[in-house]
């Protein structure tokens, strides 16, 4: 009886072990950590230009003036670790200085922000090993649409949420709304990763694979935020070594860790489809054998 149970358990865990081996093999072949380092470098280079472009878009629409403040606080509170307040203060100073630039400098900011999107596109298609390239004009249109519509849609969602919370009938649902708002960062991360894994690759990605990979990445991202904040709070070695400049290495490490999570979710999405194809091929070979 015990031997039968052990055999069944071993038989059930064998596919999972094979899938994990395939996942590790792809991570090693794709040099995932190196890709994450490249994206972290480009992200840090593009951070201020990207934020400057986003805030400039909000400034162009007076209806989003109040929402932009809420969105700013939401981003720094939920997508950066414990030092979000310090980083926010520095970035806002940099953005304020960028407002004094000429038209040529503004174009440079936009190009730098688009460079980040191109790097993300290149890294994800490397993981999917896609050889098909989009037309340059189409790629530019997609990047520009994400750069312009993304912040506006986020601002619109926050405006709608604020409006619903202000309604009288919503006062009886405060508990439910509070619970929903607590998981809102997780849902937003999940949807963002799902769109990233579904749209960016130039080959077709099965929707269920993208959903699973995005969900794992969202969970790791939320857990990583809490773990990183706990580490910074409990083991303040960076503050002891770097003093006032501690925010710089903390931001570097957090951005690198974030891209590791994003690319790991992409690897999981790819491996799910590849493992399914390999399994179907193996079953087909068994059926063809006399």
UniProtKB/Swiss-Prot annotation:
What kind of membrane protein is this, topologically? Multi-pass membrane protein
The residue spans the entry assigns to the Periplasmic side of the membrane are as follows 62-100, 164-182, 235-243
Regarding protein family, the annotation reads:
Belongs to the UPF0761 family.
Species of the source: Escherichia coli (strain K12)
Q: Per its UniProt record, what NCBIfam families does this chain match?
A: PRK01637.1, yihY_not_rbn
Q: Where in the cell is it found?
A: Cell inner membrane
Predominantly, its location class is membrane
Which residue ranges run through the membrane?
A: 39-61, 101-120, 141-163, 183-205, 212-234, 244-266
- One Pfam family here: Virul_fac_BrkB
Side Cytoplasmic, residues: 1-38, 121-140, 206-211, 267-290
Instruction: Show the GO cellular component annotation of the record.
Output: plasma membrane
Q: What is this protein called?
A: UPF0761 membrane protein YihY
Q: Which InterPro entries match?
A: UPF0761_bac, Virul_fac_BrkB
This protein's UniProt keywords: Cell inner membrane, Cell membrane, Membrane, Transmembrane, Transmembrane helix
Question: Which top-level group of life is the source organism from?
Answer: Bacteria
């Amino acid at each position: 009886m015990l031997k039968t149970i052990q055999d069944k358990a071993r038989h059930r865990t064998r596919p999972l072990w094979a899938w994990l081996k395939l996942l590790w093999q792809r991570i090693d072949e794709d040099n995932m950590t190196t890709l994450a380092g490249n994206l972290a470098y480009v992200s840090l280079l593009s951070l201020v230009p990207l934020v400057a472009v986003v805030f400039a878009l909000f400034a162009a629409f007076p209806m989003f003036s109040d929402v932009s403040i809420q969105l700013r606080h939401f981003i720094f509170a939920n997508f950066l670790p414990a030092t979000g307040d310090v980083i926010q203060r520095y970035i806002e100073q940099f953005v304020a200085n960028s407002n004094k630039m000429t038209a040529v400098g503004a174009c440079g900011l936009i190009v730098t922000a688009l460079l980040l999107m191109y790097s993300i596109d290149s890294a994800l298609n490397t993981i999917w090993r896609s050889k098909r390239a989009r037309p340059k004009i189409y790629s530019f249109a997609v990047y520009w649409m994400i750069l312009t519509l993304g912040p506006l849609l986020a601002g619109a969602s926050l405006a709608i949420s604020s409006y619903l919370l202000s309604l009288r009938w919503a006062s009886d649902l405060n508990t439910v709304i509070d619970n929903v708002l607590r998981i809102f960062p997780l849902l937003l991360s999940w949807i963002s990763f799902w769109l990233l894994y579904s749209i960016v690759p130039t080959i077709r990605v099965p929707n269920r694979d993208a959903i699973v990979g995005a969900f794992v990445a969202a969970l790791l991202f939320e857990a990583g935020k809490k773990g990183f904040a706990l580490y910074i709070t409990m083991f303040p070695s960076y503050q002891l070594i770097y003093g006032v400049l501690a925010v710089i290495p903390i931001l570097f490490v957090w951005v690198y860790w974030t891209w590791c999570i994003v690319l790991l979710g992409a690897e999981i999405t790819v491996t799910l489809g590849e493992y399914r194809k390999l399994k179907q091929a193996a079953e087909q070979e068994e059926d063809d054998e006399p």
